[in-house]
Amino acid sequence: EEAITLYNKIILGGQHDSSIYFNLGNSHYKLNNVAESIYYFEKAKLFSLKDEDIEINLAFAKNMTIDSIDPLPKSDLLRFREYLFDLFSLNEYSFIIILFSWLTAIFFGLYLFNSKPYSKRFYFSFSLLSMLFLILSFSVSSLKSSIKKEEIFGIIFDRKIEIWAEPNFRSENLFSLHEGTKVQVLDSLQEWKKIKIANGAEGWIKEAIIKNLN
């Protein structure tokens, strides 16, 4: 618990990175805090997309949850989009955009100020190639940033919550969810929130504790 207090102080101080969230997740996992451990491992993933240790520990933490939800199969287009998104973080894409901007400018400048035909073709080809990667990186980064703002995901911290067909208790009670389950928040109406889970099921919850990952 002392470690949890220490890491929380570091986060409150404005420091955010995968190692802090990963260690915080481990600390909660050792205390069998289901929702907290999953939440912080998911936060760590946002900063380090390709870290196997995070994925392994997250899988262990998910084994403590009550809800067993089979995700919907993904289309080839969606898998390809996720592949591009997971290649680099937004910060890494920003660096790549700056890098290819400089390379495009340098190669085009060398093309303009070089008099040898072979060299001009060489520099012009590389300037076009750099520009192509610049456009691709910018497009993927912009799309990823836009979707990240629109898609709000969170972890349920309530022991158990009921999911309703409409935002009132007179509607049909569809199913229940438990702590540690990851949901997507689609809409909100006063104290109600419309959520979606990995298998595509949707419904409304009221006064639930959902800690956003975004």
Give the residues covered by each predicted segment.
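Boundary regions of SH3-family modules and the immediately adjacent low-complexity/disordered segments
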Residues: 30, 34, 117-158, 164-172, ...
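Membrane-embedded alpha-helical segments of integral membrane proteins
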Residues: 73-112
